[in-house]
Amino acid sequence: MGVMEKIKEIEAEMARTQKNKATNYHLGTLKAKLARLRNELFVEQSGGSGSGGGEGFDVARNGDARIALIGFPSVGKSTLLGALTATESEAAAYEFTTLTCIPGVMQYKGSKVQVLDLPGIIEGAAHGAGRGKEVIAVARNADAILIVLDAGKEGLNRHREILERELETVGIRLNQRPPDVTVTKRKLGGGVRFSSTVPQTKLGPDPEKVVMQILREYKLISADVLAREEITVDQLVDVVLGNREYKPALYLYNKIDTITIEEVNQLARQPHSIVGSVNKKWNIGEPLEDDVLKQKMWEYLGLTRIYTKRKGSPPDLEERE
């Protein structure tokens, strides 16, 4: 049985299993196995590393930060790149216009932010559909991700869920921070010792048993585990694997000129979201103009401006962009 078949079998068993205190241990074991198999599959399909870019995707890092544009085909990523950086990326009324990674540089508040226009990804990208592997590999190396969605498309929420799932499958965690958990391997044996500074209600009635089983799944039979916050099985698995990328992500609902004001208001209330229209210049201005989108991108990148002065000279208090 291949890795994909094993993954589907575990997913089917998880779907059949009711979630309660009695099944918590079993579900934890299944989640650990599923994460291990997905990791094996990703490494296998990525040629052993999971970080290669592929032809047309190896772009030298430039500027103070890097942000990747992720989305389905024909949602306006190429036009958006031009609005942010004055870089021309071919745009057309048909899908899959962009076939490689197109870089541009956005200048904002004295900083240079590299913006990468990536080809549209489709469902199954994490397992190699389209050029999904290359696109997601670039996203893993970005400092932040801008997910672009077409506000006028049917199934908008499903599109968002698909993109989130594809990124999560390859170990990208959006708008999360690494859990405060430490796993220390021991050489002298002694089994798994689990301690926590807070109650672990999400690990079921016997957290230590669940932790031991998860570590055993990854052949860790002698280790100390210390949790300083309440965690889930998925978070513990992420810590054990140690190859997760935690990225700030902003969702841009583009083309709001094609929907009603009520729908715009509803989208604007979504977490980590901004609404706009590249064509109408709503919340998205010219490359050197300040606008709502650039302000949000700056905020999510977490950049800090540092002012210096020459030794012995008075400080220059004049504000410059």
Where are these regions (language model features)?
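C-terminal-of-GTPase-core extension/linker across diverse P-loop GTPases
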Residues: R16, A22-A65, I70, V75, ...
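Conserved G1/Walker A P-loop phosphate-binding module
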Residues: G2-M212
